[in-house]
């Protein structure tokens, strides 16, 4: 039955879309955590006096860093994370749209199969 193979293929596509959506949600959640962490770092840096000492962890070593350089780095990180969140959210929107379309397609195929089964039962009952 080619129709059944097509139906299974469409279900497989739907499952793939749902896995992709979960992956994007997970990615967005991770980005949100990084954003919160970076905002906290920025808030701490903003509280510091201009003569405060700032250290950056580079591998196993703490290296002194200029306060303005640290602020700039954190600001760039915030911008990057925010742009990544927007990109991931656009992907989520896209995959949600595709999932809805695919789900509708699968449901329509399922309805068609049910109608065919009902018709076959009615024809079998009429032959008796």
Curated annotation (Swiss-Prot):
Keywords: Chaperone, Cytoplasm. One of its GO terms (molecular function) is unfolded protein binding. Gene3D superfamilies: 1.10.287.370. CDD domains: Prefoldin_6 (cd23161). InterPro entries: PFD_beta-like, Prefoldin. It holds the Pfam family Prefoldin_2. One of its GO terms (cellular component) is cytoplasm. Its main location: cytoplasm. GO terms for biological process: chaperone-mediated protein complex assembly; protein folding. It comes from the Eukaryota. It is found in: Cytoplasm. Belongs to the prefoldin subunit beta family. Binds specifically to cytosolic chaperonin (c-CPN) and transfers target proteins to it. Binds to nascent polypeptide chain and promotes folding in an environment in which there are many competing pathways for nonnative proteins. Required for positioning of the mitotic spindle. Heterohexamer of two PFD-alpha type and four PFD-beta type subunits. This is Probable prefoldin subunit 6.
């Amino acid at each position: 039955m080619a129709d059944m193979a097509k139906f299974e293929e469409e279900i497989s596509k739907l499952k793939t879309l749902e896995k992709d959506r979960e992956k994007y949600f997970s990615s967005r959640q991770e980005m949100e955590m990084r954003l919160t962490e970076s905002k906290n770092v920025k808030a701490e840096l903003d509280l510091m006096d201009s003569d405060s000492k700032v250290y950056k962890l580079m591998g196993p070593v703490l290296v002194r860093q200029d306060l303005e350089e640290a602020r700039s780095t954190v600001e760039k990180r915030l911008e990057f994370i925010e742009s990544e969140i927007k990109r991931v959210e656009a992907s989520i929107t896209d995959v949600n749209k595709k999932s809805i379309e695919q789900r509708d397609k699968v449901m329509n195929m399922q309805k068609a199969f049910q109608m065919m089964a009902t018709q076959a039962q009615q024809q079998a009952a009429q032959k008796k």
